[in-house]
A protein has these predicted regions:
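Acidic, Ser/Thr- and proline-rich intrinsically disordered linker/docking segments
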Residues: 2-14, 19-84, 89-141
Length: 141
């Protein structure tokens, strides 16, 4: 079932199926960014200038992180002082670097690489490793 939301951004109105959005990013200044499905266009919502749409996004993020949704594996990952909420089932490739153990993956509807380090971000790293093992059957070593 689709989860359609109307968002106002830069004097335009977008109607977006949030079930097709693969990642959201909370920034330290309170802004929330997501990328339109099937393209790399970021939508950045500021709570000071667009409180109504900001609340819609927060409500959806709360819903997806609390519910056990079929065909999704939503996780919170802290990366470069931002909190990303990512559906790992939408990620189609992972790159593992044996010397230091880092894992890199790219957000499907964005161009941003996410690099997870086992030393500096052990909780997020473990979530990604577990997902890779469960989904692909491959073990990183």
């Amino acid at each position: 079932m689709a989860y359609w939301v109307k968002i106002s951004y830069e004097r335009k109105e977008y109607v977006v199926n949030f079930e097709r959005v693969s990642a959201f990013c909370y920034e330290q200044n309170g802004r929330v960014t997501f990328w339109l499905p099937d393209c790399a266009i970021p939508i950045v919502i500021n709570p000071q200038s667009n409180q109504q749409d900001y609340q819609k996004i927060l409500k959806y993020i709360q819903y997806i992180t609390e519910a056990q949704l079929e065909n999704s594996y939503w996780v919170k990952i802290y990366y470069e002082r931002n909190e990303y909420v990512i559906n790992l089932n939408c990620i189609s490739s992972f790159c593992y670097e044996p010397p230091n153990g880092r894992i890199t993956f790219w957000l499907p509807d964005g161009i941003i690489p996410i690099i997870i380090n086992p030393v500096s971000n052990p909780e997020s790293y473990e979530k990604v490793v577990n997902h890779i093992q469960k989904t692909t059957g491959h073990f990183l070593s």
